[in-house]
Amino acid sequence: MWKLQPTESGGESVILLAGQEYVVGRKNCEILLTNDQSISRVHAVLTVTEQAVTLKDSSKYGTFVNGEKLESGSTKTLQTGYKITFGVFQSKFSLEKECIVVCSSCVDNEGKVTLSQDIRSVGGRLVSSWTSDCTHLVMPTVKVTIKTICALLCCRPIVKPAFFSALSKAVQQKLPLPKAERFRPQIDEPSLARDDVDLSARPERKSLFKGKTFLFLSSKQMKRLSVAVSCGGGVSQLLDEGALPVSLLESSSTCVLDMISGNSQPVISPASKKWLDSVGQILHRKGLRFITESEVGLAAIHVSNQTYCNPCSSLQSESVKTNPVFASATLSQSTAVDETALAAPSQNITAYVVNTEISQDQSRMVTSGISAVGETPEKTNPTQKASTTNKPLSLGQEPSSTRIVQETVMSSESFSVVESEQKMKKGSVVSARGRVEGPVKQKAPSSGNTTLKHSPQKQTALTSFFQPSSKKRPRESSASSVQPEPKFFKKDIKDNEDDIQQSFSVNRSHKTSSEETSLGQACGTGQNSSSKKRKEPEQDTLLGAEEPTAADDLEMSLEELEFLMSDEMDEPPQTAANKKQRLESGLTSKINSEQLSNQQEVTESKGRKGEKNQQSSSSNIQSMQLDRAGPAVTNQDTQTQSKRSPPDLEAHSSANKGPSKNKTPELEEVKKEEVSFVVNSRPQNGISQTSEAVLKQEMQASTSNSGPKNDPDLPRKLLQVQFMSLTVNNSSRSRPGPLQTHNPNDKNVKRFRKKNVPGFDGLPKIIGGSDLVAHNRSKHSELEEWLRQAAEEEKLNEREETLGDDLFRYNPRPAKKR
């Protein structure tokens, strides 16, 4: 855009657009000079292009270019700065070329289209990035961006998009040009006060950074801010990674830009982190600091470099404070997290553990190449530990407390050295098959040296950590042979402990302390561990109540139990209700054992029939019983075993391979009679039927006394889950025959069958609606509640914004004319 600027004050400038011709004259022309009598009606013609302006003289008194008179009818090409005089009086102008280069910021696409049309109408152009050639910055509202900082430092006006619409209209209608101050946008920065910000052109901003060197640590940061630094008179310099120019860094005129302040999630290598720390140490040693990117904009807005972009000053504003540099490794490697169990209401499972505090003495055990990991102590306060020892545990105790217990896996193989010494001291019967047959009641040695050698962590059993919970799923008798080993130990030990307490609750009811159960560690050096088989927990104690005549074994078991009852107890005492229940069950089992012994004498002749088939099974079960618990069990497990079906007994007995080393003739005979009584009894005479009726009564009495309703250790409130396939199969319908029988000799008149209309036989079963409702809707209740609250908050915010927009929207309705 070219412009004829009058040399005398008070005159109006004339805009010359490219591609048009302008006639200078006194009447009926584009450029009127009415106050000069030496101006002809058609004095001269100006032809405007992008590069130059051509002048053709057609006047009477002449036209002068830089003081030289043009000949009449001649043509002269004019350049920027030429002085032109029309006539002989005071119609003097200077030719100037004004390039309108507009940069836009925060303008939407529709606004850019309109803005570009207005700028092209006055001979300008629209650019997307700021350069030194830009003359205007267009923003709807002022936000502190790199373009805003550059426009302030270059003293360029910041205007609204409406400014160029008014400029285009003024040029076309030859009206006075609009002023940029009237189209200045408002500030839209919450951290800046409108009264403190001056967006007008102030020349001191051009030299705001003069004499300062801005040292950049990354090339991206330098590319983004170097234009703003150069607009303020500063010098930009990139510091190579690893370089430490001490003299440059220690200078007070050097502004070291913080590399992390501009990035929300910087990715810094360890070498770069070490280099940044070295640069920071050099700065702190001289009392200097890093400069953040925001300080460049604040210095340009406030026209001051005393506080901002001054490494010697300290900032109190939170918005420009330097952020500490963290290594990326701390996100995943230097964070200590305690693995804790969730609260009971969220898991819907309540698990408790007993006090298993580790001894202060150092423990040592000989593993002979086999490693085992013990349990860690429970993290509780001393007061909580004392209360746990003195109070009985219940299923509802402390549902919200958090316990930290590290679960470990115990090897199925045993420690040979420990087992051999314990076998000699305790006198207990241990199986030589190379597997743990069951828990053996033992007393911890009183000697301190022996404890250090053979009792790591006081031989804590797995039952301390795998207590039966009321939320466990019931197991079928056929599936117990393949259950995991730790769970098998837990259930087996619990049953054995209950049986011992029931047997001796009458004679030793004054005892209030509970027993400490430890996992029997079997020695299996001569056998292969791959031949280990799991038995049912009820079969392990099958022969306990059928030996009333074995006086020697009974005395040995009584001495062993007295030895156990006097030991220290770490397990919490049982409740009074459980003791009373076990007392009653013990008396009942004693009576049942006497009745069952009388019945076995009557049916002894029938038991001889299946002697050969059950011989191997009874010997294996007898050996297993002698190895696990001895004769110190009640008749309750015997009645439970008698309720099993013949396939179960045969399946479990066949799993035990190899003969037993310890055999007693009397026990073997009794066991044969019992197995034949259960398996091979047939209604041959009245005596057998009577014994079966008595056995049914005994089974009912045993079930009523030790049923799942009265036994607190059995699981309750179980949930049965069934997986159904939601498919619909079309039922095959038989094709109805014709109404009339077909005779091949008759004439074929009408032989067709009408087809029923769909829906005639009833609507099909449609799976939908309530059939597809999820079973457990409370599983994601917290997530659904959070989503619902978020949706309500969003609707509330939208409603408030709508009310605010309606409040400030001004749409007056025109009044109706009457």
UniProtKB/Swiss-Prot annotation:
Keywords, A to Z? Cell cycle, Chromosome, DNA damage, DNA repair, Meiosis, Nucleus, Telomere
Q: Which GO terms describe its cellular component?
A: chromosome, telomeric region; Mre11 complex; PML body; site of double-strand break
Gene3D superfamilies listed in its UniProt record: 2.60.200.20, BRCT domain, Nibrin, BRCT2 domain
Q: Say yes or no: keyword DNA repair present.
A: yes
Q: What biological-process terms (Gene Ontology) are attached?
A: DNA double-strand break processing; double-strand break repair via homologous recombination; meiotic cell cycle; mitotic G2 DNA damage checkpoint signaling; protection from non-homologous end joining at telomere; protein localization to site of double-strand break; R-loop processing; telomere maintenance in response to DNA damage
Give the location of motif Nuclear localization signal in residue numbers.
470-475
The biased composition feature labelled Basic and acidic residues covers: 603-612, 663-675, 793-808
Sequence segments annotated as region (Disordered): 372-716, 729-757, 793-818
Q: What does the record give as the function of this protein?
A: Component of the MRN complex, which plays a central role in double-strand break (DSB) repair, DNA recombination, maintenance of telomere integrity and meiosis. The MRN complex is involved in the repair of DNA double-strand breaks (DSBs) via homologous recombination (HR), an error-free mechanism which primarily occurs during S and G2 phases. The complex (1) mediates the end resection of damaged DNA, which generates proper single-stranded DNA, a key initial steps in HR, and is (2) required for the recruitment of other repair factors and efficient activation of ATM and ATR upon DNA damage.
**What's the record's remark on domains?**
The FHA and BRCT domains specifically recognize and bind phosphorylated proteins.
**Assembly and interaction partners:** Component of the MRN complex composed of two heterodimers rad50 and mre11 associated with a single nbn.
Protein name (record): Nibrin
User: What organism, scientifically named, is this protein from?
Assistant: Danio rerio
Q: What is the lineage of its organism?
A: Eukaryota, Metazoa, Chordata, Craniata, Vertebrata
